[in-house]
Amino acid sequence: MVDWPDPGTPVRLTVKTWAGLAEHTGLALPPAGPKLVTLKLVNGYNISFPHSYVEDVEELDEAPMVEEEPEPEVEQDESLPLVHLIHTGGTIASKVDYRTGAVSARFTPNELLDSVPELRGIARIRAVNLGSMWSDDIRPRHWNRMLQATSEAFSEGAVGVVITHGTDTLHISAAAMSYGWAGRGGRPPGRIVVTGSQRSPDRGSSDAAENLIAAVHWAAHGPEPTGYRDSSVVVLHAGSSDGSCAVLPGCATRKYHSSRRDAFKSINQEPIAHVGLGPDGPSIEMGEPSAYDARTEAIAPMMFEESTKIAQFVADAHLQPDMVQAAIDANYDAMLFHGTGLGHLPIADPQEDSPENTRLRIMLADHCAAGGVVVVVTQTIHGPIHMDVYDKGRDSRWCSLTRAEEGGHSEP
């Protein structure tokens, strides 16, 4: 049994390896698992060893405890544009508490400017902390809070806002911001950027700082939004290496990869722009210009109805009529089907051996005839919906199913 010191204690750990004894110096953390010791190394990475590998644990001299004093308000360049940073969660604006190993929000202007000093020359920062949520726990009520925070930012003189967000559902919230501000044909008063990081700030490979710099630069100095692809944008790494961040349309972006730094790509279209991050500071390289004139500026965003219930189904061999009937019986406001190929559902029985297909067809037709809302998109990442290529598509029209005809792929 290893006598492991309290979290936050400076230690020198000696462990047995195949090459002999090795020493590691850092801060003790809570064990990452049973019968493990875990250390925060000086390079920011965590390392764990089984108890059986531990040869010696030496506690180093404690650093003198200094009583923290309130920090004075950081001075910012008043000539720079004002940008509000709205924190909802995620690791991009977080710090590690080395006493506990926990991650907490780092979200005062002082903390942000100290950790990412490049922001000082880009914009004046005003921080707003909406919470620290796992992105998969976000609901429509949280989209409304984000929309309200963006509206307040613009009314207080901000030229842009940056929403920091966990990456797993970042693209969905970005789409919500886009539809909230532009869903009625308008455009937001300023730039709305949603960003996050795939790697936490305590890791040497973290993308947090570059993503935040690029996002703030776009929010402060990007072009005025037109209300089309750019009502909100996603700004994250363009590739696995540093040096460039992509500016992606908030209503047409998807997370492609669970862990890569360039996990997000735009769907059926090119990025709006790229933000280069070179030694001379950030710079914007625009893509193809918009073919549309800017919409009228919206006075306020459209809020989402928080009680709306939408049932989602995947069209495959296991889609059963009773699953759909349960949603109908529960009075869901709408049903969304992720169809196959060009947007098809299992509603035909050519071999007369799958009566559930016929039941599903009749059930959906009756539901639509009674005023129910049924929308079909395609599971494929790219490509449109097209209902006139196969009989299945024309049969769906007969059922009165609604197709997302233009770019109806399974993005937000």
Where are these regions (language model features)?
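Conserved RNA-binding domains used in RNP assembly and mRNA/RNA metabolism
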Residues: M1-Q76
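Internal helical hairpin/lid segments
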Residues: Q320-I381
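Glycine-rich oxoanion-binding loops at beta->alpha junctions
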Residues: R124-A153, V314-I328
